[in-house]
Amino acid sequence: MEIMVDFPGGSRVDAHFKSFTVETDQPTENDGQNAAPTPFEVFLASLATCAGFYILGFCKKRGIPYEGIRLVQTMEQDSSTKIVRKVVQKIQLPQGFPEQYISAVKRAADSCLVKKHLEAPPAFEITATVRS
């Protein structure tokens, strides 16, 4: 997959891939207009939505109602480096959710591909060339 990034103005940085555009910005105190999430916020949201996707798929496959299920994600950051040291994902299940599937729905969330990439990170190669 190829992602093309451009700079539409201010502190905006947008990513284009397939037929989608992911818009990002910075808060006003960081020279942005706060018109979109920061790239890091998009990254954190991708962890939560990925886990949610696996929870949804688990429920659909088994015919379990998924209405009322919520996933709440919080992060614990190192105050000096601002690096996230711990991500906590709490799956809130509605009354009547089948007891026998509680552990399995946790395993489904744990299967998230974004999370798997953090557990076995890829190598990065960065180059710079002048276009002709």
Walk through the language-model features, giving the residues of each:
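Extended beta-strand/beta-hairpin segments
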Residues: 1-45, 55-132
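Alpha-helical metal-binding/catalytic segments enriched in His/Glu/Asp
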Residues: 50-51
